[in-house]
Structures are given as C-alpha cells and as structure tokens.
Amino acid sequence: EEIAEELLDDVMKEDTWDIHDNLSFPLPVIIICEILGIPIDDIHKFKRWADATVEQMCSEDPQQFEKELSHMRDYLLDLILKKRKHNEDNTLLSRIAHSKINSNYLSDDEAVNLTVQIFVAGNETTTSLISNLVWRLMTIDNLWEDFVNDKIDINNAINESLRYDPPLLGLFKTTSKEVNIEGNIIP
C-alpha cells in the first residue's frame, strides 16, 4: 500500500500520466524486488528482462532474447552466490540461496530458475491485472465513480477482472519425470 501511495503521489504532481508506465509497471517490480531482496535501482532492467522472458515463450525466434536473459541470469546468480557467503537474512532470495535438499544447496541453475519464475510470474500478471482493471473501471459507465465512492468491493472487482480479462491465457509446465495420464505418456 505504501509503495502504491508513493507512486500515486508522484504521478499526481503531473498534468498527464499513464497508468501502465507510472503504476502498473513499477509497482509489482518494486514489490517483488523488495520481497526477494534485490536492489530496485535497476528496475527498468528487471522489467526488460521479465518482458524478454515472457516474449521468448511466444516467439518464433526465441534465440533473439538470449542475450537479455543471459544478463538476468548472471545478475541473479551473482546475488545468490553473495547471499550464500553471508548469513541468511529475511529476504526470499537469501532463503532460496540457503535452501537445501538432502543436505545439498539447490544447484545454481535451480536457484536462478526459481528466482526467475517468481519474478516473471508475479510481475507480468500483476502489471496486466492493474492495467486491465483500471481500464475496465474507466470505460464502463459509472464504474469508476462507484469504485472511488466505495460502492464496489475491491476484492470482487479484482476477481471479476481476473475472470473477464485474465492476464495469462496459458500455462507452460515441464514434467520432472515421465508421467502416464489415462494411457498418455508425457515425457
């Protein structure tokens, strides 16, 4: 709430502003960076990396995003290795860095991949949710007025927005071992 209020305080000083660029984009990135314990100084870098990750999944030429993704992975690995050298702190990244399975740390790839997934999943979906919800509230008669006058429950508005304008239209999953589902083998 505090971060959203700070962002809104900044934009209220402007004559015009963009909901996506000034609120929907930075809010989830800042929050995720704070939860993970990643410095937010490079917020635009992280947004670019997150966008590249999503675009790569849908691209006919996924290799075009490899340079950006390599920079992100290197940056995150460096942070994870630094966290492993120091005592565990209260950040999620520290907990990932110090996580063990059978007395062994997660591999570097596992720790980086988990961090990327957390960052991308929380960022893209929340950015889209905020933008879609505000757009709907402002384009349907009287909804914005009802919303600002507390005639619309925020939780119901969010749930309806997720149902009507979902930020994600598909999920990609990979199995860790071969699975048989109703006679269909999934490698």
Regions found by a protein language model. Give the residues of each.
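Cytochrome P450
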Residues: E1-P187
